[in-house]
């Protein structure tokens, strides 16, 4: 059959709690990544002496690794018959890794006086490790949106979720440029 679209903005944003939480998580997840990944990381790597091909090569390798991890992500999360009882707690655990790894990366950068490791090495290693929970969380969220989407408005719920993804990326990109401009 034909699904019915939302009749008002309030109805469009009045999704189920699960859809709204996933959309908010998507905004923050991709916004937080892109705020440093779009401008800050390339500028940092250039300032560390990397050339165009090395910076572009790292970004390409990171993106390809991220895609590869997403491909195997379903095997890293046990499935439940209802599609939510194991998957939602797993998303929470993977979200903790998304918080802890950047904190460890910052701590690693602060130990420069103790451990003679170049900051670029710490950042690159940290980002490669960060790709794992980021990709698993992204994949898991993409699964969960389908589990949470209402049958009558599934396409609208999924579209709302991916619009939130785009909003997060746009926000992160704009903030990345703003931070660069502000010095």
Each predicted region: which residue ranges?
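A membrane-interface helix-boundary motif in multi-pass transporters
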Residues: 1, 178-183
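Helix-loop boundary and gating motifs at the non-cytosolic
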Residues: 18-60
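Transmembrane alpha-helical cores of Major Facilitator Superfamily
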Residues: 60-64, 159-167
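Intracellular juxtamembrane helix-capping segments at the cytosolic ends
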Residues: 136-149
């Amino acid at each position: 059959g034909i699904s019915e679209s939302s009749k008002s903005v309030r109805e469009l944003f009045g999704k189920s709690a699960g859809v709204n939480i996933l959309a908010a998580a998507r905004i923050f997840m991709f916004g937080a990544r892109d705020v440093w990944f779009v401008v800050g990381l390339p500028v940092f790597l250039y300032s560390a002496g990397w050339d165009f091909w090395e910076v572009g090569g790292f970004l390409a390798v990171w993106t390809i690794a991220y895609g590869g991890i997403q491909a195997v992500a379903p095997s890293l999360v046990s499935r439940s018959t209802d599609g939510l009882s194991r998957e939602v707690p797993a998303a929470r655990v993977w979200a903790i890794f998304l918080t802890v790894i950047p904190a460890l990366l910052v701590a690693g950068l602060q130990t420069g006086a103790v451990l003679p490791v170049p900051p670029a090495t710490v950042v690159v290693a940290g980002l490669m490790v960060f790709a794992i929970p980021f990709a698993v969380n992204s994949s898991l969220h993409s699964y969960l949106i389908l589990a949470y989407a209402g049958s009558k408005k599934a396409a609208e719920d999924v579209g709302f979720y991916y619009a939130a993804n785009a909003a997060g990326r746009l926000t992160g990109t704009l903030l990345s440029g703003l931070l660069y401009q502000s010095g």
